[in-house]
Amino acid sequence: MGQEKLYIEKELSWLAFNERVLQEAADKSNPLIERMRFLGIYSNNLDEFYKVRFAELKRRIIISEEQGSNSHSRHLLGKIQSRVLKADQGFDGLYNELLLEMARNQIFLINERQLSVNQQSWLRHYFKHYLRQHITPILINRETDLVQFLKDDYTYLAVEIIRGDTINYALLEIPSDKVPRFVNLPPETPRRRKPMILLDNILRYCLDDIFKGFFDYDALNAYSMKMTRDAEYDLVHEMESSLMELMSSSLKQRLTAEPVRFVYQRDMPAALVDVLREKLTISRYDSIVPGGRYHNFKDFINFPNVGKANLVNKPLPRLRHLWFDKEKFRNGFDAIRERDVLLYYPYHTFEHVLELLRQASFDPSVLAIKINIYRVAKDSRIIDSMIHAAHNGKKVTVVVELQARFDEEANIHWAKRLTEAGVHVIFSAPGLKIHAKLFLISRKEGDDVVRYAHIGTGNFNEKTARLYTDYSLLTADARITNEVRRVFNFIENPYRPVTFDYLMVSPQNSRRLLYEMIDREIANAQQGLPSGITLKLNNLVDKGLVDRLYAASGSGVQVNLLVRGMCSLIPQLEGISDNIRAISIVDRYLEHDRVYIFENGGDKQVWLSSADWMTRNIDYRIEVATPILDPRLKQRVLDIIDILFSDTVKARFIDKELSNRYVPRGNRRKVQAQLAIYDYIKSLEQPD
């Protein structure tokens, strides 16, 4: 079998994942407004795909053609464009279908031609008092440099200003970062009707208000467009430049980076399309996509709650871990010292972690706090706690990852604010991102210093903890806390040798340990001992690890995979991966936690990790995986994994065809894993 038959291209696998998101928008069992929001998630994902994956592919094509090689990447580009076009056609059809369904529920998203006289008057007042201040036309002439002016992934209206036989052009930015994209209009008869209008259409209606008095014209026509830029940046090293200065400079590069996709309204006149392509220096490698009247559907993620309660998901109130609420504990440290605590978001509340850090910030017994941040919430209480801790005389060290994609600017801001407050801020070495999810609290207890550690699979982010599934392990077990301390020492001194007996730490020992554990399963299978591998990942694309899993399958090891996103491995290939089953689940929460389970001859090993099985995570980032040493907590993770693999509602097969076929229910009972996990955790969190 040829090499190309053993692996799915990661870009195509990623698009298949986004098509699963689109399936959720099409799923009539989902509430109507949630289906609209899935359209927004699909659109947001696709924007990121073009910024990152497509831009990387474009660079590969340019390099290979400069070297005179026959580029496989060019063939892949064609496959991508074909797949995106087909999915986008499905998107357009779904959007129209959902508009009709909303109308049946008395929710009307109307355009500027459907306004009543009363609504027209109301809109002009709204424009004058709330919107006009944010509108400044960009006139397109010979001197205009649109590459410098246009913002990445913003929607613009390209306006024809027609006077006789002369046509001039201007651009209007849709200011959806300053004004809501969805605007509720005053109701008409009957009163139960709920009309809304998009910001785009308000500008279309008010074109005269924008241009009158400044231009002579016979007609104004507006067409929507959007440009996506390459999200990569170059870190040009200079002896006198700090990493923060380099990142700030590189972010400015991103703002004017190469366009990689140009989407425009399908009926935009060809002459205007040509002007925009020329001004944006759109090359033949870029994706030029004619589309509908509206772009930036990512704003539909925040589609407002309107209409009846059954149009959105029934809420699942986040659960408290009742161990923290026992009267015998004076604080969170007492609870964790007595036994390890495992939290699983968003089923559990993130409040426990926030409260522990708040307590640490003023507890007289706390000596020091170390934490690493990758993506934090906009109004982060964790940052506030670190600042308060510094003000209270604690020794506070915050490791800020300045190279967290799309969060670089926010992290530069946090780094400056923390430094000003007296916090010791350190950064990763360039090229070695810190993706681990750790904190370490050192506390004086009697004559001893006791350490409390957090090892997680997700970010310290209050917002994503409500949307992403992730684990937090809180422990005072010295076997783990001593090694978390070593990780922080390694971060501060990345070129000093360091060893770990319990933790799996990239780039130190992850690949070696994973290979050893897979090889042990192979040996056990060959000896007739219990064997098996179960993995829950966001992405599985490292060829070395994929090949090791193929070898395990060939030796009779049963491999079960739950991969949300990219998966290069092809299950069920005869003679290669007969013993590998792979599924993916897309539902109301984003499956984000990483879990590795090895049968280990009957004594299961369960690991929680920040690392996906991608080359960058294994070899070029600082990642941490921890074994679950407490048998109770180990069983809890195993139970949750069993529920996920029993899903008969939201699980799809991962296969060679990228078909996204749903796992058939057959005669099994209906199990929607995320709802079943909520019930499972709720059953555990009952008062004594």
UniProtKB/Swiss-Prot annotation:
Modifications the protein undergoes after translation, according to the UniProt entry: An intermediate of this reaction is the autophosphorylated ppk in which a phosphate is covalently linked to a histidine residue through a N-P bond.
GO process terms (BP): polyphosphate biosynthetic process
InterPro entries, per the entry: PLipase_D/transphosphatidylase, PP_kinase, PP_kinase_C_1, PP_kinase_middle, PP_kinase_middle_dom_sf, PPK_C_dom2, PPK_N_dom, PPK_N_dom_sf
EC class: transferase
Keywords per UniProt: ATP-binding, Kinase, Magnesium, Metal-binding, Nucleotide-binding, Phosphoprotein, Transferase
GO MF term set: ATP binding; metal ion binding; polyphosphate kinase activity
EC numbers for this chain: 2.7.4.1
Active site: H435
Residues binding ATP: N45, Y468, R564, H592
Catalytic activity: [phosphate](n) + ATP = [phosphate](n+1) + ADP
Highest taxon listed in the record's lineage: Bacteria
Statement: the UniProt record of this protein carries the keyword rRNA processing: no
PROSITE patterns: PLD
Location of the PLD phosphodiesterase domain: 430-464
GO CC terms of this entry: polyphosphate kinase complex
Xref: HAMAP family: Polyphosphate_kinase
Record function comment: Catalyzes the reversible transfer of the terminal phosphate of ATP to form a long-chain polyphosphate (polyP).
Family label: Belongs to the polyphosphate kinase 1 (PPK1) family.
Protein name, entry field: Polyphosphate kinase
Native source organism of the sequence: Salmonella typhi
Name of the gene: ppk
